[in-house]
Swiss-Prot record:
Protein name: Galactose/methyl galactoside import ATP-binding protein MglA
GO molecular function: ATP binding; ATP hydrolysis activity
Function of the protein: Part of the ABC transporter complex MglABC involved in galactose/methyl galactoside import. Responsible for energy coupling to the transport system.
Binding, ATP: 46-53
Family of the protein in this entry: Belongs to the ABC transporter superfamily. Galactose/methyl galactoside importer (TC 3.A.1.2.3) family.
Keywords, in A-Z order: ATP-binding, Cell inner membrane, Cell membrane, Membrane, Nucleotide-binding, Repeat, Sugar transport, Translocase, Transport
Quaternary data: The complex is composed of one ATP-binding protein (MglA), two transmembrane proteins (MglC) and a solute-binding protein (MglB).
Species annotation: Pasteurella multocida (strain Pm70)
EC nos: 7.5.2.11
Pfam families: ABC_tran (PF00005)
Compartments in which it is found: Cell inner membrane
Cytoplasm among keywords: no
One Gene Ontology cellular component annotation held by this UniProt entry: plasma membrane
Amino acid sequence: MTTQIPNQDSEILLTMTNVCKSFPGVKALDNANLTVRSHSVHALMGENGAGKSTLLKCLFGIYSKDEGDILFLGKPVNFKTSKEALENGISMVHQELNLVKQCTVMDNLWLGRYPLKAGFVDHGKMYRDTKAIFEELDIDIDPKEKVAKLSVSQMQMIEIAKAFSYNAKIVIMDEPTSSLSEKEVEHLFKIIAKLKQRGCGIIYISHKMDEIFKICDEITILRDGKWINTVAVKGTTMDQIVSMMVGRELTQRFPPKTNTPKETILTVENLTALNQPSIQDVSFELRKGEVLGIAGLVGAKRTDIVETIFGVRERKSGVIKLHDKEMKNRNAFEAINNGFALVTEERRSTGIYANLSIEFNSLISNMKSYISKLGLLSNTKMKSDTQWVIDSMNVKTPSHKTNIGSLSGGNQQKVVIGRWLLTQPEILMLDEPTRGIDIGAKYEIYQLIMELAKKDKGIIMISSEMPELLGVTDRILVMSNGKVAGIVNTAETSQEEILQLAAKYL
């Protein structure tokens, strides 16, 4: 494919040329390039570990580049700190929101640069300026509200407003829709359109292809730290982008279904959670070797089902049976001992210990099995089990002692799944297992799910991605406002039928 650069008449705001960055044993960037124009949304794409975040951290002053040139507004720059980048017109909306939750919205917006009057903070001006920005961006939040009381999407709006307040020319957005509802995503896109109209260049990182093709003008693809291509969205297909990202053609998005569901292994009858609003009278069966999907709109209480089964959400009534034997599952420890495992939705906050090793993260759910009768840890067994996780899950890592936080999202998720497999579960529950994972790593997770189903595991998979549910599962349970709206055979259903069921009890 020939390189296409659209909008030749647009002003070039940023040029990064032949940027290199190495860490011990790893060349993270190898002559990477990026050109961003005014009035445009520029997608930066690549598999996890391709160098996207490293490139932007070199721009934003978090990392110092080893080689290469950065031109911003026609002048060479080499920002030493993120504060310097901000003050010069480059802003970043992080995936993990950097807000002080104990402070008010307006305090967060003007932190470190409060307006002063006679040597004191001018709260009136701060309020008025915040209100003016919010009105321009259609943000309906009280500037005096404590950040701790806001939703994730509202916090994200504050981060964007902060970029706006700095009069940023370049706004970097890293997976901005990962925790947003469909309505919130639409609001975000309207704000992006306003920033674009204002003359900003937006650098947009996302694994969601539909978003890229909806709001972006150009795409730069990185692979293994190298620049692969920059293309116009118009005239480029999804398959071409995927091929450039992974270095090969992905002929199928999903592996073939080679599992055979057998007899019923799990029965859930009239399950109701204690603290409402939550799930009410949820009933279903799961068979050995079956992948049961759970679909529903945001707020449908899909996660509440697996949390109640796993004992981390208290049960008011209902019965859970494994092999026709009733399971109390009063807490997670009891559930684990009974053969249940839960891979949680928010990998970064509840799934991994980012600053600890792969070994620790692999073994933490099964630590009791490494303690001898004398109370000593068996280092040999710990090392062999960690190696089993790395090998069987195909985790790409230099060492079992590597901090898990330094791995890509896909490799982190493989470690989490491997950790649970060490407990030898019969029921594996996966909540948004491919969220924030690139398309190549997603395929590996799908293959893993299929292999586990072939080994007669009962698998429950919650997903907000409809193609994923239709491509991986055998049946789909559809939730609507805490109730089961229907259970459909995947091979016989459609996206339209699932969406109709999802709206049944609204």
